[in-house]
Amino acid sequence: NSEVKYSTVQNWYSGDENGKGGIYNFVTKRGLCAESNSKISWTQVETGSAITWKYPSCILAGNNSKGEFYSVALTNHYQQADTGSKMIHIGKNSRSKIISKGISTGNSINSYRGKVKVSLNASRARNYSQCDSLLIGNSSEANTFPYIEVYNRSSIIEHEASISKINEEKLFYFMQRGISIEEAISLIVSGFCKEVFTELPLEFALEADKLLGLKLEGSVG
């Protein structure tokens, strides 16, 4: 019945507006749910570094074990983020959940890359994955690369992906009510990320929300 919750907010130097300089952020995080009813939950907010590769993994070996992954990745200027999760189901009745929110602006590229694998003996395993991308401006890019392997017919795998854009109509709605464009974008992004922020400790969630607002300054216009 053990539980581990690991939360990070990353804001390494991302380079200048022309994409020069910046930290390369390559991270390895793995967790093993070895016994029954164990749980691992990864929560991360990525706003910095020039290039980020990050794929926290859960090996769900115990029966009734659970793995969760909640992520927000914001890229601006010439940043590149390739993030996601791996959920490996081995135990019976194991459960996993993946919630990924990607925001792309400037000339940046933001990609979700995840793997869900259900082994032959993982009867009645279940996974739910939701990958949402938000584009700001006309030069940014968002991608989703799901990899799903299922070897047990009693398992249930659900995957949803969406890409949307902050259009002029939405911004005009806010401006009619006396809200500036930058503040409007910040509010829209904050609502977009709410599902992940609620999984962070309160002080982390407040700082992450402010950090995204600062990173988005000047993203339009």
From Swiss-Prot:
Main localisation: plastid
Pfam families: SUFBD_core
Origin: domain of life: Eukaryota
Matching InterPro entries: Fe-S_cluster_assembly_SufBD, SUF_FeS_clus_asmbl_SufBD_core, SUF_FeS_clus_asmbl_SufBD_sf
GO cellular component, one term: chloroplast
Biological process, per Gene Ontology: iron-sulfur cluster assembly
Keywords: Chloroplast, Plastid
Compartment(s) of residence: Plastid, Chloroplast
Presence of keyword Acyltransferase: no
Keyword Plastid: yes
Family: Belongs to the iron-sulfur cluster assembly SufBD family.
Protein name as it appears in the record: Iron-sulfur cluster assembly SufBD family protein ycf24
Species of the source: Galdieria sulphuraria (Red alga)
Encoding gene, per UniProt annotation: ycf24
